[in-house]
Structures are given as structure tokens and as C-alpha cells.
């Protein structure tokens, strides 16, 4: 994921 991206920047969770």
C-alpha cells in the first residue's frame, strides 16, 4: 500500500 501507499502511505497508510
Swiss-Prot record:
Inhibits spontaneous contractions in several muscle groups. May be involved in the expansion phase of feeding behavior in sea anemones. Keywords: Amidation, Neuropeptide, Secreted. The modification 3-phenyllactic acid is found at residue 1. Neuron specific. This is Antho-RIamide-1. Its main location: secreted. The modification Isoleucine amide is found at residue 4. It comes from the Eukaryota. Transmembrane segments: none annotated. The keyword Secreted applies. It is found in: Secreted. It comes from Anthopleura elegantissima. GO terms for biological process: neuropeptide signaling pathway.
Amino acid at each position: 500500500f501507499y502511505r497508510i
